UniProtKB/Swiss-Prot annotation:
Disulfide bonds listed in the record: C33-C62, C40-C55, C45-C63
Family under the similarity heading: Belongs to the beta-defensin family.
Protein name from the UniProt record: Beta-defensin 14
Predominant location category: secreted
Subcellular location field: Secreted
Amino acid sequence: MRLHYLLFVFLILFLVPAPGDAFLPKTLRKFFCRIRGGRCAVLNCLGKEEQIGRCSNSGRKCCRKKK
């Protein structure tokens, strides 16, 4: 039974990101951008696209074709 507690602690430590490392939130943002029919643009959206969100805090934008 103690082994279960130890494995649980290692699982929690593995999933909690280190300070400055946003792997899990960044991946989730990209995933939700794709679900909404968008793509992650590096700097700006193209002329025929609109911004519907953000893919990261560093400036990547989630863009989708205008309706």
